[in-house]
A protein has these predicted regions:
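Conserved glycine-rich cofactor-binding loop
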Residues: 14-15
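The beta1-alpha1 cofactor-binding region of Rossmann-like NAD(H)/NADP(H)-dependent oxidoreductases
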Residues: 55-67, 99
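Substrate-binding pocket helix/loop in short-chain dehydrogenase/reductase
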Residues: 93-94, 101-103
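Active-site helix of classical SDR
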Residues: 117, 153
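Residue(s) in the substrate-gating loop at a strand-loop-helix junction
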Residues: 137
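Active-site-adjacent segment of SDR/Rossmann-fold oxidoreductases
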Residues: 142, 163-173
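C-terminal helical subdomain
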Residues: 170-173, 177-178, 195-235
Length: 235
């Protein structure tokens, strides 16, 4: 896909991977709309990237339909690429599990992601093409201690990705999951303060590069899943 002039919606675009991906895509000539919960942060990203913005909490399930209409209006009623990046985390051992923590994570990572995608699919079907990028995690490949809530939410995203691939390929809609390993960001940080880069760890730039590369592949092909690891994070 040639990105010049393409309309792209990125959820969770006010920080981290979403912010850097917006920068990559705008620099390629795309029309990018980012969502987030903080007007202040969105305005800062607008200055950094040149992307449009809208205050939109993906976890507010009841408002997704109306907010999707607002997004479409800001993108001339056409979305070429949806990047489901918004996400949150929670670390709990099995004896600490509770329904409130599950709902907090699943409302964003699974339910909000699914309902937003459902709302946008008719627009892509009308065009008979489109690309959906789901941001997963290497936690969707293997569980870990304390990962019951977060890892299971990303396993769910992986299942959704595979189901949508089977359903949407006949409409020329590509669905790809990008699984970053650890990236120091504001993710799971209550204060939502960006973390400093750590030597030998991935940065948001590597993930933004992977996402952009997956989108730019010619439309006749697609990458079904892309795992991104740091080469040598152990030093």
């Amino acid at each position: 896909m040639n990105l010049k002039g393409k309309n792209i919606l990125i959820t969770g675009g006010s920080l981290g991977i979403g912010k850097e991906t917006a920068k990559f895509l705008v620099d390629k000539g795309a029309n990018v709309l980012i969502t987030g919960r903080s007007e202040e942060r969105l305005l800062a990203v607008k200055d950094y990237t040149g992307a449009k913005h809208i205050v939109f909490d993906i976890a507010d399930i009841d408002n997704i339909s109306s907010k999707t209409k607002d997004c479409l209006n800001l993108l001339d009623n056409k979305i070429d690429v949806l990047i489901n990046n918004a996400g949150t985390g929670c670390r709990r051992d099995v004896e600490q599990l509770n329904i409130d923590d599950f709902l907090h994570v699943y409302n964003t990572n699974v339910f909000g992601l699914s309902i937003l995608t459902k709302e946008i699919i008719p627009n892509m079907k009308k065009q008979n093409k489109g690309t959906i990028i789901n941001i997963g995690s290497t936690a969707s490949l293997k569980g870990y201690k304390g990962g019951s809530i977060y890892a299971s939410s990303k396993f769910a995203v992986r299942a959704l990705t595979q189901c949508w691939q089977a359903e949407l390929r006949p409409y020329n809609i590509r669905v790809c999951q990008v699984n970053p390993s650890e990236v120091p960001t504001a993710f799971a940080n209550k204060e939502r303060i960006e973390r400093e880069n750590i030597e030998n760890k991935l940065t948001t730039k590597e993930i933004a590069h992977a996402i952009t590369s997956a989108i730019e592949m010619d439309d006749r092909g697609f990458i079904n899943e892309l795992n991104v690891w740091a080469t040598n994070p152990f030093n």
